[in-house]
From Swiss-Prot:
Protein name: N-(5'-phosphoribosyl)anthranilate isomerase
Pathway membership: Amino-acid biosynthesis; L-tryptophan biosynthesis; L-tryptophan from chorismate: step 3/5
InterPro entries: Aldolase_TIM (IPR013785), PRAI_dom (IPR001240), RibuloseP-bd_barrel (IPR011060), TrpF_fam (IPR044643)
Lineage, broadest ranks: Bacteria, Pseudomonadati, Pseudomonadota, Betaproteobacteria, Burkholderiales
Entry annotated with the keyword Isomerase: yes
Amino acid sequence: MPLHRTRIKLCGLTQPDDVDHAVALGADAIGLVFYPPSPRYVATGRAAELARRAGPFVTVTGLFVNASADDVARVLDQVPLTLLQFHGDETPEQCAEIAGKVGLPWLRALRVQPGTDLVEFADRFAAAQGLLLDAFVEGYGGGGHVFDWTLIPPQWLSQSAPPSAAPRLVLSGGLSAQNVAGAIERVRPYAVDVSSGIEAARGVKDRARMTAFVRAVREADAALGASVQA
């Protein structure tokens, strides 16, 4: 058994078959997008069906962009989310207010670019359950681009550092079956998040790519475990 296990979040699912396949693959989490301009947006009625199909042991994440507490609460009236992901310009106070109102843990996404002070950002959002790092693009949502992983503070990457020295990192941004092993080897994230890397077209998931991505993560974890035990 590998000593390192990278959690897997498959994001932007829109179809029941996508969710069924994600569950069958053993994904730890799925992501549902509640940002209407996104091609991966799902209305609450469809989202409720998708969330129910995930079952009790898969985290159902709701992605919101600058939504109000009332907007999020209205979604929760119909959709059994278990985690919130704030992907806009929300302040720490706004995140805490919204999450407190609906009683759910939350992640804060950051679109990384040169000059971004990740340590300062992590300190501001210390109440989050994790920090999701994505590539910077104009507008909101993922653009399928990989950001420069050397921008991640080196103290967060040290395997000898205590867990309290770094936030739980959820690595996103242009990941695919072709590059996720390298990402895991370099960054050792708590989790990886993928959307465009498992699509045949924008908003259309591809089961073969989903399978290949999960397999690549598992193989990378196994390789890390073998290197630790050697």
